[in-house]
From Swiss-Prot:
Protein name: Elongation factor G
GO terms classed as biological process: ribosome disassembly
Stated family: Belongs to the TRAFAC class translation factor GTPase superfamily. Classic translation factor GTPase family. EF-G/EF-2 subfamily.
One Gene Ontology term of the molecular function aspect: GTPase activity
Coiled-coil ranges from the UniProt annotation: none
tr-type G domain location: 7-284
UniProt function note: Catalyzes the GTP-dependent ribosomal translocation step during translation elongation. During this step, the ribosome changes from the pre-translocational (PRE) to the post-translocational (POST) state as the newly formed A-site-bound peptidyl-tRNA and P-site-bound deacylated tRNA move to the P and E sites, respectively. Catalyzes the coordinated movement of the two tRNA molecules, the mRNA and conformational changes in the ribosome.
InterPro entries in the record: EF-G-like_DII, EFG_II, EFG_III, EFG_III/V, EFG_IV, EFG_V, EFG_V-like, G_TR_CS
HAMAP family for the chain: EF_G_EF_2_B
One GO CC term on file: cytoplasm
Organism: Cutibacterium acnes (strain DSM 16379 / KPA171202) (Propionibacterium acnes)
Lineage of producing organism: Bacteria, Bacillati, Actinomycetota, Actinomycetes, Propionibacteriales
């Protein structure tokens, strides 16, 4: 494979709120760059990027397919990211391997809640962004309102590269404030592939000059090098100098460059492509990736995006291709990967052999022999590698920092209809969990049912849909249930438990004394061994820890997992003959269970951040309804003539909300919801949940 000039590569993501036109924008990019010969519309379920059947039916993007295309002499690798909040893990996962992103906003709504979530995620990974204000042909679209929401809701500094020419159905092009010309799309033929570059319309000259002056001023304020040129003579700065300064500012996330258009009507996409090339980073513009030595996190290592550095790769997505089987999408951070190479999975300490390497165009593929640093591709043949794991050179191992995934908040029981379905279900679960680590699966100890947990109702719907459609599992599906947690509210300084069993022959004996201490939310679990003088032999300590953790999976109130606790093993005793790992595991488990009863246990429920946008006429109804659902109103603001109510509401109260809201507001209000945190259940609610959980026992 010919060596790629990395300065001519852009690894980008296109991110947005659901329905902002992200998939349509990606489709147009693929069309104008010559990769897609018939434009696919989300409206008719034919979009090239949306390649799973459910996506085509639902008109939303669920998996991030990676595709490679070219604009002039620059290679653009695009990761398509989902806009629905249930799939934020897909977004996190793709942002992890991107160098830059395009945030697409709806020209009518401006910055919406999911846009804010994704923006925060991009900031967390330090991904430079440019904005594209889409759908400016729609009734009610307002470029100025969108720019205002970028300032107010994202707390970003927008630098306008363009102004729209014409509004709503009269929208016909853009004023380019960098080059100071107009680009117009007049005919509907050729699907917008050609546009005219002409003088700025006379009635927009003053507005354009004022906007350009403001743009140059903002850039100068954030770039010292440009400031000197600008102060010397504002009229003498060249287009190249302006572009270079904007590029530096975007790469430093000092400000965000703003473009506009209407992808559906084929206007404004080519200048967006130019902006991607001009202002978003190449792999050489981003810092070297850091990691650590396997087995010793204190030894920090770095890899630069060079072909002659040792190989380091991050697996960021696993997908099942109906023809090829399991495909692993990877980003090569350093070194060169060849088909047939043996590599080390440093996360698991296992060797893997690379099969074929593909560059993907949505769901079409091109086989290649090798791929260098800074590139994204899909590989076959990996048996043990899952999302977030590192593959590397066996002689220079490194683990790149992994991704952290949120805990699921909603679960559903699945009962296969026959023994054959049980086997198919096991296979389906293994494959689907491998693809998306935010699905968690466990077996209910009492009922024997398989419980699947996920990030929201749509998330579980898609899981069950794929299980039936791709793996042909016939099953009865239970109602979605809330994933409660248990917590401890007071410390227990000392609790002693002795496990003793004598049934002829060697018996079982283990004595442990533990202390338990509740910790702050998000702390997780910590086990401290404070045993001295060999009172419990070293080899039995991990068994006590394992017993405690096993017991924590089933809390004493209602059998939900216990969170945020520190357990200290203080002392104990053993017997030369009768003690064993199993005896200490049982002792650890029972000691925690009994001590937890004395630690004032409480029930936690997932609280969702809910944002409702409603006409003022229905504001009272919406607030009253949220209050009746135990919602805590956080704030109310006015946006675009509507009222926006933000509240924290328990997930258990939100089932069926979409239908209720629609009927109470005649379909005029909309809402979005995402997980916020776990909060304590009021005792009246907790008593009911506990009684229900223990009722069948």
């Amino acid at each position: 494979m010919a060596k790629t000039d990395l300065s001519k590569v852009r690894n980008i993501g296109i991110m947005a709120h659901i329905d902002a036109g992200k998939t349509t924008t990606t489709e147009r990019i693929l069309y104008y760059t010559g990769k897609s010969y018939k434009i696919g519309e989300v409206h008719d379920g034919a979009a090239t990027m949306d390649w799973m059947e459910q996506e085509q039916e639902r008109g939303i993007t669920i998996t991030s397919a990676a595709t490679t295309t070219f604009w002039h002499d620059t290679q653009i690798n695009i990761i398509d990211t989902p806009g629905h909040v249930d799939f934020t893990v897909e977004v996190e996962r793709s942002l992890r391997v991107l160098d830059g992103a395009v945030a697409v906003f709806d020209g009518v709504a401006g910055v919406e809640p999911q846009s804010m979530t994704v923006w925060r995620q991009a900031a967390k990974y330090g991904v430079p962004r440019i904005c594209y204000i889409n759908k400016l042909d729609r009734t009610g679209a307002s470029f100025d309102h969108c720019v205002k929401t970028i300032k107010e809701r994202l707390h970003a500094i927008p630098v306008l590269l363009q102004l729209p020419i014409g509004a709503e159905d009269q929208f016909m092009g853009i004023v380019d404030l960098v080059e100071m010309n107009a680009k117009t799309w007049r005919g509907e033929t050729e699907l917008g592939a050609h546009y005219e570059t002409e003088d700025i319309p006379a009635d927009m000259k003053d507005e354009a000059e004022a906007a350009r002056a403001e743009m140059l001023e903002t850039v100068a304020e954030n770039d010292e090098e440009f400031m000197e040129l600008y102060l010397e003579d504002p009229d003498a700065v060249t287009v190249d100098q302006v572009k270079a300064a904007i590029r530096r500012g975007v790469l430093a996330s000092a400000f965000t460059a703003v473009t506009c258009g209407t992808s559906f009507k084929n206007k404004g996409v080519q200048p967006l492509l130019d902006a991607i090339v001009d202002y978003l980073p190449s792999p050489t513009d981003v810092p070297a990736i850091s990691g650590f030595k396997p087995g010793d996190e204190s030894v920090e290592l770095e890899r630069r995006p060079c072909d002659d550095e040792p190989l380091s790769i991050l697996a960021f997505k696993i997908a099942s291709d109906p023809h090829l089987g399991k495909l692993t999408f990877v980003r090569v951070y350093s070194g060169v990967l060849h088909a047939g190479d043996q590599v080390l999975n440093a996360t698991k300490g296992k060797k893997e052999r690379i099969g074929k390497i593909y560059q993907m165009h949505a769901n079409k593929r091109e086989e290649i022999e090798s791929i260098g640093a800074g590139m994204i591709c899909a590989v076959m043949g990996l048996k043990d590698t899952t999302t977030g794991e590192t593959l590397c050179d066996q002689t220079n191992p490194i683990i790149l920092e992994s991704m952290t995934f949120p805990a699921p908040v909603i679960e559903q029981a699945i009962e296969p209809k026959s023994k054959a379905d049980q086997e198919k279900l096991s296979n389906a679960i293994q494959r689907l969990v491998e693809e998306d680590p935010t699905f968690r699966v466990h077996t209910d100890e009492e009922t024997g049912q398989t419980i699947v947990a996920g990030m929201g109702e749509l998330h579980l719907d898609v899981f069950i849909d794929r299980m039936k459609r791709e793996f042909h599992v016939e099953a009865n599906i239970g109602k979605p249930q809330v994933a409660y947690r248990e917590t401890l509210r007071k410390p227990v300084e000392k609790y002693e438990y002795t496990h003793k069993k004598q049934t002829g022959g060697s018996g079982q004996f283990a004595r442990v004394i533990i202390a338990i201490e509740p910790k702050e939310p998000g702390f997780g679990y910590e086990f401290v061994n404070a045993v001295t003088g060999g009172r419990i032999p070293k080899e039995y300590i991990p068994s006590v820890d394992a017993g405690v953790q096993e017991s924590m999976q089933f809390g004493v109130l209602a059998g939900y997992p216990v969170e945020d606790v520190k357990v200290t093993l203080l002392d104990g005793a053993y017997h030369e003959v009768d003690s064993s790992e199993m005896a200490f595991k049982i002792a650890g488990s029972m000691a925690f269970k009994e001590a937890a009863r004395k630690a004032n246990p409480g029930l936690l429920e997932p609280l969702m951040a809910v944002e409702v946008t409603t006409p003022e006429d229905y504001l009272g109804t919406v607030i009253g309804d949220l209050n009746s659902r135990r919602g805590q109103i956080q704030e109310m603001v006015e946006e675009h003539g509507n009222k926006v109510v933000r509240a924290l509401v328990p997930l258990s109260e939100m089932f069926g909300y979409v239908g209720d809201l629609r009927s109470k507001t005649s379909g005029q209000a909309s809402y979005s919801m995402e997980f916020d945190s776990y909060g304590e259940c009021p005792s009246s609610v907790a008593d009911e949940i506990i009684a229900k959980a223990n009722g069948g026992k």
